[in-house]
Regions:
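C-terminal-of-GTPase-core extension/linker across diverse P-loop GTPases
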Residues: 1-10, 14, 18-31, 35, ...
Length: 190
């Protein structure tokens, strides 16, 4: 409990390198991780600041991303590394490059040993939860889309121009939107 709200944390203990443990145990670990991610509202992906983003971190991030979860990248042991005025910027740049498919993920730098910034984690969890369940009115979405189209015209193919009619939000967790167009073949998946 924190400030009268209840939070349940599930520690998967991460995935292991195959050369460190047997494949059967690795398979079980993956199943546990996937199950924990599916149960979660927000995934706290803990990265060791002394190691950076590992292959296992990227796997867990991919699982959470594919399941549309809110994600907070928690960089632990921030107190254990040498820092200068560019350290945080460089670390974030590395995270964003490695996990480029999830630019929406929040990043937080903490120290479990000293307690540095741990209390702020609850505020971040609440904010991510709120963003995951946010509903945006169709009128507001259409205004944003109209402004975007005014700044950057949609592409055309062989003289046929993509027309965006309107956009609406169809679900939350994760927020999902549908855009109605004249020809879906002209619309890029991203």
């Amino acid at each position: 409990k924190y400030h009268g709200k209840e939070y349940v944390f599930i520690d998967t203990a991460g995935l292991r390198r195959k050369n460190k443990i047997k494949e059967e145990l690795e398979r079980y670990s993956i199943i546990r991780t996937v199950t924990a991610v599916e149960r979660a509202d927000v995934v706290l992906m803990v990265i060791d600041a002394t190691e950076g983003v590992t292959e296992q971190d990227a796997k867990i991030a991919g699982i959470a991303h594919e399941r549309g979860k809110g994600i907070i990248i928690v960089v632990n042991k921030w107190d254990a590394i040498e820092k200068d005025d560019k350290t945080m910027y460089e670390f974030e740049k590395n995270i964003r490059n490695t996990l480029s498919y999830m630019p929406y993920a929040e990043i937080m730098y903490v120290s479990a040993m000293t307690g540095q910034r741990l209390s702020k984690l609850y505020e971040m969890i609440d904010m991510v939860m709120e963003n995951q369940t946010l509903r945006i009115a169709t009128g507001v979405l259409n205004e944003i889309m109209t402004e975007a189209v005014a700044m950057q015209q949609p592409p055309s193919d062989k003289g046929k121009r993509l027309k965006l009619y309107y956009i609406t939000q169809v679900s939350v967790k994760p927020p999902t939107f549908v855009i109605f167009v004249n020809d879906k073949e002209l619309m890029h998946f991203s």
